[in-house]
């Protein structure tokens, strides 16, 4: 009986940790999608989710790790104005779709952005101020973003 109870408790703890970590992973992904593309409609949000997935596959990192890598998604940079709004973003009407994407990242089709690994606003790209994008042509455009394969 004691072994059975211990096994049950161990399994419940395992489930709780798994659920909590998945929730945390999905939350970070949903927040990233919202911060980066909430004004670009579903297509723009989907494109950002696809970029997260491409980076995850290429770098062999979890979606959360990809989102939180320094200087990869500006919304997580310490001085970015979106950083302070991350929890608030989850209250927006677009959050439902962001959560849906975050829960179903395995189903996101990365071909919609031609396997792009990077993106920026079209406006910023046209300024030529970003070194890594100089002389590069976008492989896709979604919402206000240009997507690049580096």
Predicted regions, residues:
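Bacterial extracytoplasmic/cell-wall-associated proteins, especially those involved in peptidoglycan
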Residues: 19, 24-150
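Single-pass alpha-helical membrane anchors
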Residues: 2-18
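Low-complexity, intrinsically disordered regions enriched in charged/polar residues
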Residues: 1, 5-7, 23, 67
């Amino acid at each position: 009986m004691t072994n059975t109870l211990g096994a049950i408790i161990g399994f419940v703890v395992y489930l709780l940790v798994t659920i909590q970590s998945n929730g945390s992973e999905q939350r970070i992904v949903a927040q990233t999608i919202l911060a980066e593309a909430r004004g670009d409609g579903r297509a723009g949000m989907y494109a950002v989710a696809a970029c997260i997935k491409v980076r995850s596959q290429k770098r062999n990192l979890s979606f959360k790790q990809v989102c939180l890598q320094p200087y990869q998604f500006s919304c997580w940079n310490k001085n970015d104005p979106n950083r302070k709004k991350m929890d608030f973003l989850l209250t927006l009407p677009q959050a439902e779709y962001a959560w849906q994407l975050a829960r179903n990242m395995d189903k996101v089709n990365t071909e919609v952005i031609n396997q792009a690994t990077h993106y920026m606003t079209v406006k910023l790209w046209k300024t030529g101020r970003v070194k890594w994008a100089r002389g590069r042509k976008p492989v896709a455009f979604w919402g206000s973003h240009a997507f690049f394969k580096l």
